Amino acid sequence: MQPLEVGLVPAPAGEPRLTRWLRRGSGILAHLVALGFTIFLTALSRPGTSLFSWHPVFMALAFCLCMAEAILLFSPEHSLFFFCSRKARIRLHWAGQTLAILCAALGLGFIISSRTRSELPHLVSWHSWVGALTLLATAVQALCGLCLLCPRAARVSRVARLKLYHLTCGLVVYLMATVTVLLGMYSVWFQAQIKGAAWYLCLALPVYPALVIMHQISRSYLPRKKMEM
């Protein structure tokens, strides 16, 4: 079994130019949506007005922006750092995921402090339960990535298989994060501020980057890795 590389997969040779440009445009839009939605949630939260106000801010930074961009780094058409080497992209991926974990930890700390101070019970909604599972899965993914970064120190014998698991589970974790964000939009806090057609638009925004990322991983990496295992 040959060592597996994580790199950019070129587009098919006979692919129409229009299709190629449409795919690139969808990637640019995914970056804009990830950034714009994070800014929107930050403005909506009015950080500093309460302990709770920091929770959506840091969680949006963690999952809607940092994690999304860390995954898109490896996209053949959508990466903002397409000019970087594979080694540099891996380092940037680690930096993005580390920042995501730090922001998620801060977001968790603020919501626990807020509910404790208000004497409210924890884990009473689907949003909180799925969010807790997402945080746990994110931590497991980080450990898996650490093993891939230092396979000899971690005594990993089947690196190719672990990379496949890391890719597949990484997609699942990001989709779990997207579901958590969607469930948060059903909260009293969010629905008190966003109503009508605007609410449905907000519901669609986090789904779009998730679809782009799902297509990226399933099309460009998973079939290739299964063949090389």
Curated annotation (Swiss-Prot):
Its EC number is 7.2.1.3. The keyword Transmembrane helix applies. GO terms for cellular component: membrane. Its main location: membrane. It is a multi-pass membrane protein. Heme b 2 binds at H93, H166. Heme b 1 binds at H55, H127. It is an enzyme of class 7 (translocase). Residues 1-24, 75-91, 150-169, 215-229 are cytoplasmic. Its cofactor is heme b. Binds 2 heme b groups non-covalently. Keywords: Electron transport, Heme, Iron, Membrane, Metal-binding, Translocase, Transmembrane, Transmembrane helix, Transport. It is found in: Membrane. Residues 22-224 form the Cytochrome b561 domain. It catalyses: monodehydro-L-ascorbate radical(out) + L-ascorbate(in) = monodehydro-L-ascorbate radical(in) + L-ascorbate(out); Fe(3+)(out) + L-ascorbate(in) = monodehydro-L-ascorbate radical(in) + Fe(2+)(out) + H(+). One of its GO terms (molecular function) is metal ion binding. Residues 46-53, 113-128, 191-193 are lumenal. Probable transmembrane reductase that may use ascorbate as an electron donor and transfer electrons across membranes to reduce monodehydro-L-ascorbate radical and iron cations Fe(3+) in another cellular compartment. This is Probable transmembrane reductase CYB561D1.
